[in-house]
UniProtKB/Swiss-Prot annotation:
Protein name: Two-component sensor PhoQ
Source taxon at top rank: Bacteria
Described function: Member of the two-component regulatory system PhoP/PhoQ that plays a role in the regulation of resistance towards polymyxin B and cationic antimicrobial peptides in response to limiting concentrations of Mg(2+). May function as a membrane-associated protein kinase that phosphorylates PhoP in response to environmental signals leading to activation of specific gene promoters.
SUPFAM superfamilies given in the database record: ATPase domain of HSP90 chaperone/DNA topoisomerase II/histidine kinase, Homodimeric domain of signal transducing histidine kinase
Organism, as annotated: Pseudomonas aeruginosa (strain ATCC 15692 / DSM 22644 / CIP 104116 / JCM 14847 / LMG 12228 / 1C / PRS 101 / PAO1)
GO MF entry, a single one: ATP binding
GO CC annotation: plasma membrane
Amino acid sequence: MIRSLRIRLMLGAAALAVLFMLALLPALQRAFGIALENTIEQRLAADVATLVSAARVEKGRLVMPEHLPVEEFNLPEAKVLGYIYDQNGDLLWRSTSAADESINYTPRYDGRGNEFHTTRDAKGEEFFVFDVEIDLLRGKQAAYSIVTMQSVSEFESLLKGFREQLYLWLGGALLVLLGLLWLGLTWGFRAMRGLSSELDQIESGERESLSEEHPRELLRLTHSLNRLLRSEHKQRERYRHSLGDLAHSLKTPLAVLQGVGDQLAEEPGNREQVRVLQGQIERMSQQIGYQLQRASLRKSGLVRHREQLAPLVETLCDALDKVYRDKRVSLQRDFSPSFSVPVERGALLELLGNLLENAYRLCLGRVRVGARLGPGYSELWVEDDGPGVPAEQRARIIRRGERADTQHPGQGIGLAVALDIIESYDGELSLDDSELGGACFRIRFATV
C-alpha cells in the first residue's frame, strides 16, 4: 500500500493523463486521415477539371493534347493517373503516367455526377478514384466519364509519418504534463511539509504549539491540535500538582505516626507492634514516592524527545561503582557513542537506574549495556553474569509490583516504575537469558 499522499495523487493524475492521451490518439489519427482523404479528393477533382478543360470533341471523336498542363500526367512514373471512358465503358484515353498501369476499371454511370472511392489494380495495389460523369457533346447525357486516380500508398506513407510524429508529440506532451503536475503537487504540499516540520519541533520540545500561518484548509486541524496540546499540558500539570499536594498532605500524618511509633518503642512490651507499625509507615512512604515518580516521569502526549545514551550510562555506573566498590564490577558498553533513545532524560535516568542497580546487585562481576537501532524501533538491554531467572518465574517478575530478589527488603517499586515508564512510551519489556550467564532485561521503543 502506498502511504505517500503526494505519490497517490501523482499516480492518479498520471493514470488519468495517460488514459486521456490514449483516448485522444485514435481521435487525432482519424481526424487527420479524414482531412487527408478530403485533400486528396479535392486534388483529384482539380485534376479532373484540368482534363475537362483540355478535352475537345472533333467530328464526334475525343481529342486530347499531347502535353497536359498538370505535369504529373506527362511523367511515366508519376502517381497521378488520368482516364477517359465513353458511355459504354470503353477506354478512350489514358495519360502517359497511366501507360504501364493495368487497372480494370468500369465507370458506373449511376447519375450521381461525381464519385470518390477506391479500386485495385491487377497487382492488388489500391488507388483513390475520382469519377466525374460529364457531357462534352452539349446535349447528350453523360457522354463521357473522366477519371483521375492516385495510389493509396502515398496516403498511407503520409499517415504513417503523421502517426509517428503524433506519438512523439503526445509522449513529449505527457512528460511535460507530468512534470507540471509534479511541480504543482510539490508546491501544493509545501504547507503539509511545513506542518510536519512544526510537529517535529513540538515532538523534540523546540516549540509548544503550531503556528497560525497555514492554508485555510489546514487551520481547523492546527487549531484542534493546539487545543489538544494546551489541554494535555494543563491536565499533566494538574495531575502533578494533585499528587504533589497529596504527598505533602500525607507527610504530616506519617510524621505523627512515626513519632508515636518512636514513643511506643521505648516500652519493651510494644516492640512487635512498633515493628509492624513502622513497616506499614515505610510502605506508605514508598507508595507515595512511587506515585510521585509516575506523575513526573510519564511521557507527554505529542512531545517525543531523544536522549544520548552514553552520558547517562556513564553517570549511573560511576555512582553504582562507588556503592558496589567491593564487587569490582566490569562494565561493557555495546552501543555506539552517538546512540540516542526516544525517551526524556528524567525517565531514561530512572529506567536505566533501576535496571543497572538490579544488575550490579545480583551480578558476580560483569554487567553489559547494549543498544541497537532496528527497522522502526530502538532497542536497549542490560544483562549480568548473576544467577539469572528461571523461565517459569520471568512472567511473574516483569509484572508490576513483583520482586526478582526476595532475599533483600523492598516492595518491587523500582521495577514497577520502570514498567510504567516503558508503557507510557509504548515500549515493551522482555526478560531473557544473558550470554554472560545471568538475566537480560531487553527494552524496545518504537521510533515512528
